[in-house]
């Protein structure tokens, strides 16, 4: 396929997205919360402006990690809407940080038609690619932060992620410094498997947390990533461990890097960048996790090149996000999520409510109601049914 055809295909995809954006109502943020097993689970939050978010389900997980991950914990969820407008995809790191930062060998693929009930597949790289040189369990130590993008040339989704291997490490004093490169694969139509990894981007030092978006105005793909090299400080500001930008005419590269950090200057490291378009606007938000400081930082751009600081959004209360991603959802999808959340919160409240004065008959009635409510929560995404059941639980 010629490049002009690819450009036309990419433009068509942007036109489709523009058409769908007429139904966009708000922003859904999918994230994990902290470095504990409870925190390393998928959580949701909603926003009307893309900057200020309110947690769903009282800040509790939406998807339980022990039901989807080989490590029983996840990190770095990336969520997006499929090209058909009705299917949703989520990919994430299969990792438990308490086992160490060099302990993860895989990622998770998830697919849903309602944002609540997901089919899932865990991909363990040493098992899936046993004959691939350098990807054995004794050498591979990181498969981090997967994300998705549609490849018009291939006609399928490309998944890309950071790989860390022991044979790439280099000595620094009496220690060895990790080295990461970005790789990519293609996902099958069932969203249950990936092709053999291929090199996407080698920065020349460690690079993680890739995020690619197509810029139709300039006919190029823009890759945002974290410079994970050893930090140095110049006049109080870090010259490493910030968000950088690279561009390419083809999705799989080669990418040319601009050697400057995009985030607001500071002495603290950042990671987990994610770019999304503002609803009803041609402007974009670049957000990233200021993980050492306890807030997310948001910057705005009209050209995906020059960014202006907007605000720091504190992580507090039930909203305590770490590396995640944002997508647009419709009013109906929001209603569904809020109805599901209302029932989940009501169930939790009733389970926790002391019942020392209840009769045996009342206790049996509560047990049956909770069983029915949990079954409804697990089986349906119908907002009316969810709200009706929530009202029954709240009224008990």
Question: Locations of the language-model features?
Answer:
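Sec-dependent signal peptide recognition
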Residues: 2-8
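Charged, amphipathic alpha-helical scaffolding segments
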Residues: 379-387
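Hydrophobic h-region of N-terminal signal peptides that target proteins for export
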Residues: 10-18
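Amphipathic, heptad-repeat alpha-helical segments
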Residues: 339-380, 395-396
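Carbohydrate-active catalytic/glycan-binding domains of CAZyme proteins
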Residues: 20-349
């Amino acid at each position: 396929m010629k490049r002009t055809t690819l450009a036309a295909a990419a433009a068509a995809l942007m036109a489709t997205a523009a058409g769908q954006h007429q139904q966009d109502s708000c922003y859904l943020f999918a994230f994990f919360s902290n470095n504990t097993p409870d925190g390393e689970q998928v959580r949701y939050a909603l926003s009307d402006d893309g900057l200020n978010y309110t947690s769903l389900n009282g800040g509790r997980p939406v998807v339980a990690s022990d039901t989807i991950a080989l490590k029983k914990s996840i990190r770095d969820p990336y969520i997006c809407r499929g090209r058909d407008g009705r299917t949703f995809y989520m990919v994430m790191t299969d990792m438990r940080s308490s086992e160490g930062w060099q302990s993860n060998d895989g990622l998770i693929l998830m697919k849903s038609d309602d944002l609540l009930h997901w089919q899932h597949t865990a991909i363990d790289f040493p098992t899936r690619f046993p004959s691939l040189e350098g990807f054995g369990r004794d050498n591979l130590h990181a498969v981090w932060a997967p994300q998705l993008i549609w490849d018009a040339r291939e006609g399928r989704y490309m998944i890309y992620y950071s790989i860390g291997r022991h044979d790439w490490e280099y000595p620094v004093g009496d220690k060895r410094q990790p080295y990461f490169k970005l790789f990519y694969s293609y996902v099958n139509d069932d969203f249950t498997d990936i092709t053999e990894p291929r090199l996407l981007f080698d920065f020349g030092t460690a690079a993680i947390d890739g995020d690619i978006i197509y810029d139709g105005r300039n006919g190029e793909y823009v890759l945002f990533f974290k410079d994970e090299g050893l930090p140095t400080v110049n006049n109080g500001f870090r010259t490493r461990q910030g968000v950088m930008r690279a561009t390419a005419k083809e999705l799989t590269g080669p990418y040319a890097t601009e050697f400057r950090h995009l985030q607001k200057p500071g002495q603290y490291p950042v990671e987990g960048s994610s770019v999304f378009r503002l609803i009803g606007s041609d402007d974009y938000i670049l957000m990233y996790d200021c993980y050492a400081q306890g807030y997310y930082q948001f910057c705005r751009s009209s050209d995906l090149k020059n960014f202006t600081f907007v605000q720091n959004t504190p992580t507090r209360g039930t909203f305590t996000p770490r590396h995640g991603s944002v997508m647009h959802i419709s009013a109906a999808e929001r209603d569904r999520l809020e109805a599901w959340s209302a029932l989940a919160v009501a169930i939790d409240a009733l389970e926790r409510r002391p019942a020392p004065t209840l009769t045996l008959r009342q206790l049996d009635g509560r047990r049956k109601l909770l069983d029915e409510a949990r079954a409804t929560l697990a089986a349906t995404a119908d907002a009316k049914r969810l709200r009706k059941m929530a009202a029954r639980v709240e009224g008990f």
